[in-house]
């Protein structure tokens, strides 16, 4: 415990909150161009081929982003929109693609949680 005199000389430091998504620079989303689209394997105990892309953002950052949903149409030079949100079992993946925006197509035949995957409302039968 510091003495009152020590606190008068040097007050307590505020704890500075560190951003979980620094590349977005306090923006809700950022645009970027895919430089590499590939699959990677998750940490133990999970097993899959997760679809990810390396993206160069408009501010110069190069980040890895997760492509959610079943199937995608992305390739190198696709223009995409990124949002924050990490993938717990993929180290280094701190961003998600926004499906149904720019060059990223929405998920086909998606019935539930459609707004998260850029899927239009299905026609009533």
From Swiss-Prot:
- By its UniProt entry, which SUPFAM superfamilies does this protein fall under? Nucleic acid-binding proteins
**Region spans: Disordered:** 105-125
User: At which residues is 3-methylthioaspartic acid found?
Assistant: 89
Q: Indicate whether S-adenosyl-L-methionine appears among the record's keywords.
A: no
Could you give the subunit structure recorded for this chain?
Answer: Part of the 30S ribosomal subunit. Contacts proteins S8 and S17. May interact with IF1 in the 30S initiation complex.
- Which domain of life does the UniProt lineage start with? Bacteria
Q: Where is the composition biased (Basic residues)?
A: 113-125
Q: What is this protein called?
A: Small ribosomal subunit protein uS12
Annotated PANTHER family: 30S RIBOSOMAL PROTEIN S12 FAMILY MEMBER
What Gene Ontology molecular function terms does this protein carry? rRNA binding; structural constituent of ribosome; tRNA binding
Source organism per UniProt: Methylobacillus flagellatus (strain ATCC 51484 / DSM 6875 / VKM B-1610 / KT)
Q: Which GO terms describe its biological process?
A: translation
Family matches, as Pfam families: Ribosom_S12_S23 (PF00164)
Keyword Transferase belongs to the record? no
Family, per the entry? Belongs to the universal ribosomal protein uS12 family.
GO cellular component term of the entry, any: small ribosomal subunit
UniProt xrefs under HAMAP family: Ribosomal_uS12_B
Alphabetically sorted, this entry's keywords are:
Methylation, Ribonucleoprotein, Ribosomal protein, RNA-binding, rRNA-binding, tRNA-binding
User: What biological function has been recorded for the protein in this entry?
Assistant: With S4 and S5 plays an important role in translational accuracy.
